[in-house]
């Protein structure tokens, strides 16, 4: 029989101590892993059974378009180890968060940069509300042209107008020519203007049309995947014209589902798309019947569903009156703002050139009848807390 040396004996003891000291934690890890796998399996099983229920037409709430989301949610089940932010212990990480640079897409409009702190960040839903013919699509086309001029990849989804009509509006904006004159422009001059743009713009703008009230986030995701594969196109910003005439991927449009829940579902799905693809999304909505007749309105005048402004990160109204129309101006009113204080620069006026599909800044002294504007100096993206407040009553 071999004699065990003292060193070997000590090493064996240390090894046994280590095994027994880690046994409890090892068992716990194993238990968590096995439990998580079991929960995942049950979630997938339930999702498949729900999907079969939908395919057989037995679901009164969900359509077949909801199946990918149901399965995706089941596959994403996990035990999250993060149990919250510790105010004291995580102070250093929080300080780093305060000082990290956040990517923002700026406007070419001074007051819009002021109220958003220099532009809108990714993973956000930004809504413009206006009456029929006031300028919802004009705003979206103008900002899409601005983003393209910044060499950002732009995806413009239209559920209202034809692709060529949207491109026509962006042509008018970027080529600085009225829509009427576009139709009489000679081919050589048009080609020269496009080539001039091509020499300065290296990004792409893709316009995709869907039939009204038929396209949902499911279609948009498929489009994004197709563009990435076939054109190697990944958008930096997405425009959807407009939200109320999209479809929900989860809910059926029926008498059993009220407009509040249906429009809220669409808004939540589109905001989820912004988060998933790490882009800001711009869209629009109509005012309701009472708001259409008013020269000023608020969130309560949102058409069909108050769930839309509840979901959006940024919500502004475009207001037109006969007096403003005569001055070629349009009023902007902040209704919701997660980027800044919505009470500072609450109202302001922009110049509008409808023939060229353009918006532009106007001089401060030209802004009239803004009794509750609480305007601040927009210089340097004035975040609402620097500079002297200017609260003027023009009434």
Predicted regions and their residues:
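A short beta-strand-to-loop transition that corresponds to the Sensor-1 phosphate-sensing loop
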Residues: 160-161, 283-288, 321
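Noncatalytic partner-interaction/assembly domains of nucleic-acid and motor enzyme complexes
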Residues: 1-38, 394
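The Walker A/P-loop phosphate-binding site
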Residues: 78-177, 205-207, 376-379, 393-395
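Phosphate-binding/switch loop-helix module in NTP-utilizing enzymes
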Residues: 206-273
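Cytosolic-facing regulatory segments adjacent to core modules
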Residues: 116, 146-234, 347-348, 361
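Structural recognition of the conserved hydrophobic beta-strand(s) that form the central parallel beta-sheet
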Residues: 239, 280-285
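C-terminal regions of RecA-like/P-loop NTPase motor modules
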Residues: 218-235, 254, 272-277, 289-395
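Interdomain "pre-motor" coupling segment immediately N-terminal to P-loop NTPase/helicase cores
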Residues: 24-87
């Amino acid at each position: 029989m071999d004699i065990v040396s003292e060193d070997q004996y000590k090493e064996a003891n240390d090894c046994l101590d280590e095994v027994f000291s880690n046994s409890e934690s090892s068992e716990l890890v194993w238990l968590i892993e096995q439990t998580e796998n079991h929960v995942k399996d049950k979630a997938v099983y339930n999702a498949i059974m729900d999907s079969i229920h939908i395919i057989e037409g037995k679901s009164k709430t969900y359509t077949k378009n909801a199946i990918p989301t149901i399965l995706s949610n089941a596959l994403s089940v996990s035990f999250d180890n993060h149990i919250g932010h510790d105010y004291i212990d995580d102070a250093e990480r929080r300080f780093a968060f305060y000082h990290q640079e956040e990517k923002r897409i700026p406007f070419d409009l001074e007051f819009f940069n002021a109220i958003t702190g220099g532009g809108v960040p990714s993973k956000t839903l930004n809504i413009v509300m206006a009456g029929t013919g006031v300028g919802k699509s004009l705003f979206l086309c103008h900002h899409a042209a601005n983003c393209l001029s910044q060499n950002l990849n732009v995806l413009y989804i239209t559920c209202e107008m034809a692709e060529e009509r949207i491109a026509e509006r962006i042509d008018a904006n970027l080529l600085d020519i009225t829509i009427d004159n576009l139709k009489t422009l000679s081919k050589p001059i048009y080609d020269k203007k496009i080539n001039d743009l091509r020499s300065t713009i290296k990004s792409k703008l893709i316009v995709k049309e869907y039939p009204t009230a038929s396209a949902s986030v499911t279609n948009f995701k498929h489009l994004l995947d197709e563009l990435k594969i076939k054109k190697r196109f990944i958008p930096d910003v997405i425009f959807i014209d407009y939200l109320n005439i999209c479809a929900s991927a989860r809910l059926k449009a029926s008498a059993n589902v009220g407009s509040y829940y249906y429009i809220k579902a669409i808004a939540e799905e589109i905001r989820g798309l912004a988060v998933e693809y790490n882009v800001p999304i711009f869209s629009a909505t109509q005012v309701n019947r009472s708001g259409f007749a008013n020269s000023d309105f608020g969130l309560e005048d949102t058409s069909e569903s108050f769930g839309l402004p509840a979901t959006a990160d940024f919500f502004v109204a475009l207001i037109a009156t006969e007096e403003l129309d005569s001055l070629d101006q349009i009023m902007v009113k902040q209704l919701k703002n997660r980027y800044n204080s919505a009470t500072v620069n609450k109202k302001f006026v922009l110049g509008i050139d409808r023939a060229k599909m353009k918006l532009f800044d106007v001089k401060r002294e030209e802004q009239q009848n803004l009794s509750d504007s609480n305007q601040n100096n927009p210089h340097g993206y004035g975040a609402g807390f620097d500079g002297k407040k200017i609260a003027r009553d023009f009434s």
